Regions:
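Cysteine-centered functional microenvironments
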Residues: 136-141, 318-322
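Short secondary-structure transition/capping motifs
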Residues: 28, 32, 66, 70, ...
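FAD-binding core of FAD-dependent oxidoreductases
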Residues: 55-69, 73-77, 84-109, 137-159, ...
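Alpha/propeptide regions of enzymes that mature by internal proteolysis
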Residues: 92, 115-117, 218, 307
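Residues that scaffold, gate, or flank divalent-cation-dependent active/transport sites
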Residues: 10-44, 48, 52-57, 61-99, ...
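C-terminal auxiliary extensions adjacent to catalytic cores
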Residues: 2-24, 28-35, 39-42, 47-50, ...
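FAD-binding glycine-rich core of flavoenzymes that anchor FAD
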Residues: 113-139
Length: 492
């Protein structure tokens, strides 16, 4: 059986994607095991002779940090923490994102700076491997002290509480534990805090978004090129000379891709009567490229985050230190997630403008891309749908990270609101995918009005594959199923 070994090697987003998509199981490697054991042993020894309070280990939490807890109550303190912080509400987080949360939490704990028992980490790994996925809710995290409420829901099953997805059903964790022959784990000092304090809710949403944004960004170029051909657009704005004098990486990449995809196109080679195209066509390298550059930057930030220890306090056995600090704060990823939402929203914004041009009865295309307009409305309303989605995404692009509401009697007086940035980002990604699917629906229709001229072999191949599931529309028909099939096509 193929396993991914949890270690201190750099974990890439591409590797995370492979683990999730191929359902690869994980094992805690020797390096990680020893780091976890060493840190736990150090903490146990420290508890016996330390003469001062240690936040979250021998004290209460948040503004209760000045209340010292007797040694005999430390386990109950951690148990209470997990229960009391499970205050999420709203829609459930999709299981594939919760599975990402599990993986990222395991990775973070295995650096050996959190003080958890090896048994605890292995239980999380067992849950991951057996596809026992905790039920987590979208609302409840401020994005500092980490993602407390959602991570509490994720970790409730460890102590035999909460609910899980198992074999297609939502079940009580205690019942599933009984079936598996697992006992609830008795948490030791600091463990509850190590489990709850972290950025894995935000990070998992960010990783999911990046994986899908990369795919959608690629499709934006393909679909935009098909629209350009259908609109009888000019090839000159994509020539390399233009982009050498403004050498943004994403811009150069986009122009190069579009040129490659238009190679040997009869439509592109045909003489044009118009001097230039609207911005939504000729500025694709600049707009799509800016989204690519943003995605590249955000990916680098998130990759650093998923290779980090993000709980508090941080334990350093080699230096004989337990330091209360702020690695749980989500600001380093909240701002980039807001940026990525804006970038992806712009892909849908420019896409909707191309849709509008295609249905406007210009350049030899019939109004609303239907031969017998009047009795037929044709592609009039898909543009309305795209416009409504784009408008929603624009509203969602108000940055979450500019907000902060103090909590815990103002001990936690600045928070990132990164969890809100994360959930908004997921919605914007989904919206962008749908708008691009609607553009494909329109572009494929419009391209056929260019016959007998053909586009490039590449674009014609994409068109042929798409036509296997969505037909040319000759007369008005029920459009919704074709929009949904278009979305499915982009996910293949």
């Amino acid at each position: 059986m193929n396993y991914h070994i949890i270690s201190h090697e750099w974990l890439t987003i591409a590797k995370v994607q492979e683990i999730i998509e191929k359902n690869i199981k994980i094992k805690i490697g020797e390096q990680a095991e020893q780091a976890v054991i060493k840190c736990r042993n150090f903490l146990d020894t420290k508890m016996k002779d330390i003469g001062r309070p240690v936040y979250g280990v021998t004290t209460g939490f948040g503004s209760l940090c000045n209340i010292t807890i007797p040694l005999e109550d430390l386990s109950q303190l951690q148990h209470n923490l997990v229960m009391s912080h499970a205050c999420g509400t709203g829609d459930k987080v999709r299981p594939e994102i919760v599975k990402l949360m599990l993986l990222l939490k395991i990775q973070s704990l295995c650096y050996g700076h959190s003080g958890v028992q090896l048994e605890t980490v292995k239980r999380l790994a067992d849950m991951f491997n057996c596809n026992i996925i905790p039920v987590v809710y979208q609302q409840g995290s401020l994005g500092a002290s980490g993602d407390l409420a959602p991570l509490a829901h994720m970790c409730l099953p460890i102590i035999g509480m909460g609910e899980v997805y198992y074999k297609g059903n939502i079940r009580n964790a205690a019942d599933v534990w009984a079936e598996m022959g697992w006992e609830p784990i008795r948490l030791k000092s600091k463990e509850g805090l190590a489990l709850l304090n972290g950025t894995q809710f935000m990070s998992a949403h960010a990783v999911w978004s990046i994986i899908n944004a990369r795919r959608i960004s690629d499709w934006a170029d393909v679909i935009g090129t098909m629209s350009l051909e259908a609109y009888d657009g000019r090839i000159e704005p994509f020539l390399p000379q233009v982009h050498r004098v403004r050498p943004h990486q994403g811009q150069i990449e986009t122009a190069g891709r579009i040129l490659d995809m238009m190679k040997d196109s009869q439509i592109a080679a045909n003489a044009k009567s118009h001097v230039q195209d609207p911005y939504s066509f000729r500025c694709m390298p600049q707009v799509h490229g800016a989204a690519k550059d943003t995605l590249r930057y955000v990916s680098s930030v998130i990759e650093t985050e998923i290779n980090s220890a993000t709980d508090n306090p941080t334990v350093f056995p080699d230096e004989d230190l337990i330091i209360s600090a702020g690695n749980f704060h989500g600001e380093p990823i909240a701002i980039p997630m807001d940026m990525l939402a804006i970038a992806m929203s712009e892909l849908s914004n420019i896409s909707e403008r191309r849709i509008y041009r295609l249905i406007s009865g210009q350049r030899g295309l019939p109004s609303f891309l239907i031969a017998k307009s009047g009795i037929n409305s044709g592609f009039m309303i898909p543009q309305y749908t795209a416009a409504s989605i784009v408008s929603q995404s624009k509203g969602l692009c108000t940055p979450a990270s500019v907000d902060s509401i103090p909590s815990s009697q103002s001990q936690e007086d600045h928070v990132s609101m990164g969890a809100n940035a994360a959930t908004k980002l997921v919605k914007v990604i989904e919206n962008t995918e749908r708008v691009l699917a609607i553009e494909l629906f329109n572009a494929a229709q419009a391209l056929e009005f260019r016959r007998p001229l053909k586009s490039s072999p590449y674009i014609e191949h994409v068109h042929d594959e798409y036509r296997k599931i969505v037909p040319f529309i000759s007369d008005d028909t029920y459009m919704h199923p074709y929009i949904e099939k278009s979305v499915e096509f982009l996910r293949k």
